[in-house]
């Protein structure tokens, strides 16, 4: 695991090529078909070297939860182990890693009709009014969720309307943790400025590869919008807004790079508090040797 642009894929491919391993992607952007450039999806050449499971498994119009990931990942892990191989989970979606390792609370699946009702109420009365509703049914979640966070606010109210129980009540029970021995590694540059430079370089390469055309094709479908989880992925939102004429090209680049750096900061914050983690430095010689030594 590690922040975006830290070299996770390169190390995973080296591991898969030289040892009896198969890769499982742990990335909330790579699951979507047609979102290849902006998600830094492994190239056809890289996938030939080391096939990745759990990429291209959803259309961008579809939702995909941490619970969906856990179920899919457990199935893939079992299959890889049954083949006599070692699963290697690689990615930067820390919520997915946490769900897999620790288990999840038994929350109800999304209900599109209820979500539409909640959105209609928000359009009519504002999210502040819905936040007051949440405060009445689940004061603990209301303290934690800001009125300006419509995604989490909507989900908390949706859970109550489906189940009759508050999010706080339901999250007190979790499914069983991962039933396997796990060795955990994080890879990142030692200096933040190096990571920032890598992020800027990678976004410029994405633009050269045709990222704007990729977003334009997604936009032209007509069934996608910026409230979807897929279109909230860093880079895609900013490019979509640029195509809408909200700002110029240079501002789009600046905003996309800044959003990606903020994502990396959040990822590193998660990792610094992560227990039992072995750290590797991006680009350092001998990372594979160090990794294999720790796994023995």
From Swiss-Prot:
Please give the biological process terms from Gene Ontology that the record holds: tRNA modification
**Residue(s) at site: Interaction with substrate tRNA:** 93, 115
Assembly behavior: Monomer.
Q: Which organism is it from?
A: Shewanella sp. (strain MR-4)
Summarizing the function annotation, the protein's role is: Catalyzes the transfer of a dimethylallyl group onto the adenine at position 37 in tRNAs that read codons beginning with uridine, leading to the formation of N6-(dimethylallyl)adenosine (i(6)A).
Which Pfam family, any one, appears in the UniProt record? IPPT
- Classification via HAMAP family: IPP_trans
Q: Where is this region: Interaction with substrate tRNA?
A: 27-30, 151-155, 232-237
Keyword Nucleotide-binding listed: yes
Which reactions does this protein catalyse? adenosine(37) in tRNA + dimethylallyl diphosphate = N(6)-dimethylallyladenosine(37) in tRNA + diphosphate
Q: Which family does it belong to?
A: Belongs to the IPP transferase family.
Q: Kindly provide the name given to this protein in its UniProt entry.
A: tRNA dimethylallyltransferase
Q: Where does ATP bind?
A: 2-9
Source taxon at top rank: Bacteria
Q: Which GO terms describe its molecular function?
A: ATP binding; tRNA dimethylallyltransferase activity
């Amino acid at each position: 695991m590690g922040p975006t642009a830290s070299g996770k894929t390169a190390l995973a491919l080296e591991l898969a090529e030289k040892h009896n391993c198969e890769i499982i992607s742990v990335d909330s952007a790579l699951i979507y078909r047609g979102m290849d450039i902006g998600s830094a999806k492994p190239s056809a050449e890289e996938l030939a070297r080391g096939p990745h499971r759990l990429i291209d498994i959803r259309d961008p119009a579809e939702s995909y939860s941490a619970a969906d990931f856990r179920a899919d990942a457990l199935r893939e892990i079992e299959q890889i182990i049954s083949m006599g191989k070692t699963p290697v989970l690689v990615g930067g979606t820390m919520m997915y890693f946490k769900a897999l390792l620790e288990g999840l609370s038994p929350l109800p699946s999304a209900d599109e009709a209820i979500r539409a009702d909640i959105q209609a109420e928000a359009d009519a009365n504002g999210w502040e009014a819905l936040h007051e509703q949440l405060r009445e049914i689940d004061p603990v979640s209301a303290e934690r969720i800001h009125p300006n966070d419509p995604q989490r606010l909507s989900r908390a109210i949706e859970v109550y309307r489906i189940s009759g129980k508050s999010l706080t009540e339901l999250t007190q029970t979790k499914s069983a943790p991962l039933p396997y021995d796990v060795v955990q590694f994080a890879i990142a540059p030692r200096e933040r400025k190096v990571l920032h430079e890598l992020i800027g370089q990678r976004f410029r390469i994405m633009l050269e590869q045709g990222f704007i055309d990729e977003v334009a094709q997604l936009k032209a479908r007509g069934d996608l919008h910026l409230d979807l989880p897929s279109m909230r992925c860093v880079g895609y939102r900013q490019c979509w807004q640029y195509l809408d004429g909200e700002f110029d090209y240079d501002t789009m680049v600046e905003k996309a790079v800044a959003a990606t750096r903020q994502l990396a900061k959040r990822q590193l914050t998660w990792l610094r508090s992560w227990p039992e983690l072995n750290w590797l430095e991006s680009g350092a010689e001998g990372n594979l040797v160090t990794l294999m030594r720790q796994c023995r």
